[in-house]
C-alpha cells in the first residue's frame, strides 16, 4: 500500500500518550486512528502494529517509539506512543519526540499510579506545556461517585506538579469499546470528544522561525579582506544582514553586527531556522569567538553555570557506565556544540546513581554556557556519552 502524502494545509502539532503501564495508552492510540479513519483523517492501526515499536537510537540511547499520524478537521498530528516505561523516560529526557502537548491516560478502575505521577513530573521537568486527560476503562466502574473521586485525584496530582488541574479537560471513555465500534457515550463519541479537547486546549506551537534568533557556533574562520565568519546551523529565528547579535557563553557576552550571511558560498540577505550558514561579524577577530558559543538576538539568552536538571544515565547495554557514580562526580556536559566540565550534586537522600537510572541533579559548570529551561544536553566522559539530560531550572 503506497503511503499517502499528507498535504500540509493544516497546522501541525506533536503530541503523545503518557501514563501508567496497562492503563490503555496504546489501545487509545489505536482507537484514535480507528475513529478518525471513518472521516478519512487516519489509517487505522491495530494495537499490535503500534505495540511492536521499532527501536531507534537517539544520542546513543536505545528507545522504542511508535509514530502515528492522523488529522482532525483543524489540524495534522504526529503522535508518539512508547511500549515501555523506560522508553517514555528516555524519550522525554532526550527530547527525541518533542511534544507540544500530551494525552495522559488514567484507568478509572485503578486511579493514578506511580508512573502516572512520574510521567506528570517528567512532563513538568522537560517542558511538555499542555496535558489533556483521557479517563479510560470507565465501563469497569458502575459507581459515578467513584469516577468523580478518581477525577479529583487526577486534578490534585496535576496541580501538585504545577499544571492547571482545575482547567485541564478530562474526557471519560473506553478505548476498548471505541475499538469494538461501540457508539454509546463512552465508545467512539468519547474519542471524538477527546480529539475536540486536544484541538482546542493544546495551542498551535510557535514556529521555529518566529522565535528569537539563535545559532550555535560550530566553527570560526578568518577570511582575508572580509573579516571573521562564524558558521553553524540556525536553531531558531531569522537573522537579517545588518542586525545586531550577541555572542553568548564561555566568555563575557559581546555585541556585534552581522554584516553578511552566506550559504553554499552564495550571499543571502537572511538566514533562517534550519539553514547552515556562515555569518560575517563586524569588529571581532577569529580569536574573539569559539565553538560552543551562540549567536543570539540581544537579550534573548544568558550564560549560566548552575542549573537543575533531569538526567537519564545510560545502562551498560547502551554503552554507558558499568558502575554507579557518587556525589562530586565530574563529567563533561555537552551543550549544542561543545563539552564543558561540571560537578554533580545529588538529591539529599541519594548516595549513588546506577546505570539505567533517571534522576534530578544539580550541576555547576566551570565555564558559563548560553542556556535556558528545556535545553537538552549529553553527559560525557572523555567523548563517550554516558547520559542524557534536560535543564529543568536555572539556578544562577
Swiss-Prot record:
Species of origin: Myxococcus xanthus (strain DK1622)
Annotated stretches, region: G3: 81-84
Segments for region (G1): 19-26
Name assigned to this protein: Elongation factor Tu 2
Oligomer status and interactors: Monomer.
CC per GO annotation: cytosol
PANTHER family: ELONGATION FACTOR TU, MITOCHONDRIAL, ELONGATION FACTOR TU-RELATED
Membrane-crossing segments per the record: none
Keyword DNA-binding in annotation: no
